[in-house]
A protein has these predicted regions:
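Short alpha-helical "packing" element that flanks the helix-turn-helix/winged-helix DNA-binding module
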Residues: 171-179
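Basic amphipathic alpha-helical segments that dock to polyanions
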Residues: 195, 209-216
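Juxtadomain coupling helices with adjacent low-complexity linkers
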Residues: 2-26, 30-31, 35, 119-168
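A short, conserved structural fragment
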Residues: 214-224
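Structured interaction and signal-relay segments at domain junctions
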Residues: 2-11, 17-97
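Sensory/regulatory domains in signal-transduction proteins
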Residues: 81-146
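Short, cationic-aromatic polyanion-contact patches
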Residues: 169-170, 191, 224-247
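A short alpha-helical element within helix-turn-helix/winged-helix DNA-binding domains
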Residues: 188-199
Length: 254
């Protein structure tokens, strides 16, 4: 990398060094916008065209479409489709008279987004291409690290959810199926006695099931007296795991 590019990226380097994978995308793009050509806005776009973060030149639009993009938080589908076909850092023009520089963002050997520099009066040179290429590589690494952590967290939640379900008896699993069928969203108020009557089970089965899942840390359960029982799901995978191994309800006599 040239000395000029290194100097222009100093703020960007400082952010990466100080924040690492915890750095905010908006802060990175602000640093990139400072390093970019004059009158240029910078966008971080996912593969579906959604704007993850952006940095605008002096807080104003550098081109006619910036305000629309920022309000909608996405770029037009036709432009995004064109960006996804670009496999290397490319400078082009013609989109509403704007000059654009796009750098593909790759993570885990797959395309995960695009880094886009755009402005009607932007003049992109060799240094800008070097900056865009380096930034796309480092941002791809940051995104990949976060995706890996999310997958690890999801795997851990699945493991905890399955372990919690294994602690339940058959009757308690059926009770929780009835509860989740009635629960709208991830939290709500339930009347255990009514659920027990509808399910043909005793209230104690429901109480025991909730106590076990609360002890496992996958739900929060709190009695509100005559009002019922407040339930909040803490583990986002617990409902999916109940559905994955769902038991059919016994047929009622008559």
């Amino acid at each position: 990398m040239s000395i000029v590019a290194l100097k222009r990226l100093k703020q960007y380097f400082d952010l990466l060094q100080n924040e690492g994978s915890d750095v905010e995308y908006g802060d990175l793009l602000t640093a990139l916008q400072e390093a970019a050509a004059d009158n240029t806005n910078v966008y971080l776009i996912d593969k579906n065209g959604k704007i993850i973060a952006y940095a605008a030149d002096n807080g104003f639009s550098a081109s006619a479409f910036d305000e629309e993009w920022i309000v909608n938080q996405r770029i037009p589908d036709d432009l995004n489709n064109s960006l996804l076909k670009i496999g290397a850092v490319t400078v082009f023009d013609g989109y509403e008279a704007a000059k654009m520089l796009v750098a593909p963002i790759v993570g885990g050997s797959r395309r995960i987004g695009s880094l886009l520099f755009a402005g009607e009066d932007s003049k992109f040179g060799d240094e800008d291409i070097i900056i865009a290429e380096f930034a796309a590589t480092t941002i791809g690494m940051v995104i990949s690290n976060r995706l890996d952590l999310m997958q690890e967290d999801e795997a851990q939640e699945i493991k905890l959810a399955r372990s919690a379900i294994k602690s339940l008896s058959y009757s308690e699993i059926l009770a929780m199926q009835h509860i989740f069928d009635e629960l709208d969203g991830n939290e709500g108020l339930l009347v255990a006695s009514r659920i027990a009557d509808n399910a043909g089970i005793t209230r104690s089965v429901i109480v025991n099931a909730l106590r076990k899942l609360a002890s496992a840390g996958v739900v929060e359960s709190r009695s509100l007296g005559m009002k019922g029982t407040y339930l909040r799901i803490l583990n986002k995978e617990i409902r999916n795991e109940f559905e994955r191994q769902r038991y059919p309800y016994p047929k009622k006599d008559g």
